Amino acid sequence: DSFYAVMKFFTILYELSRCEGARSLSSSPFARVETHSDSRRIQMIQQYINQNYKQDIRLGVVSQMAGMSPVAFSRFFKTRTGKSLSEYIIDVRLGYAANLLIDTNNTVADICYDCGFNNLSNFNRIFKKKKNCSPKEFRENFRRKKKII
């Protein structure tokens, strides 16, 4: 009986993976998967960003933490992560924002500012560009899918 339940579960997961309109609801930085980088500098900076994403994070401060010039650090970070520092920070903030949109009833504006963005229209524009929908649509889509399941 439990074997068939597990098989049914895997069948459902398989069908969902093949769904044409499937979209990811969470970005990889939010998943907080341990970094594959062997660099202590990168790990230290990623930890700093995850702990301080609500604050203004400056390249000069972060590069100083890593003991590098801003130009050298930018090159080093992009080589190791595949993203610029600002892209990485935005992805982390969007991950937290997506989580808050799903788990809370906070307004989009509150979530925007709680996640370190300082401009609501900029937040909406970036969110739509990265997630292919507005924050409001993201929340509505998730809640609609949650009711179906």
Regions found by a protein language model. Give the residues of each.
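Basic/polar phosphate-binding segments, predominantly the helix-turn-helix DNA-binding elements
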Residues: S28-H36, Y48-L94, C112-N141
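Residue at a beta-strand N-cap/secondary-structure junction
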Residues: D56, N105-N106
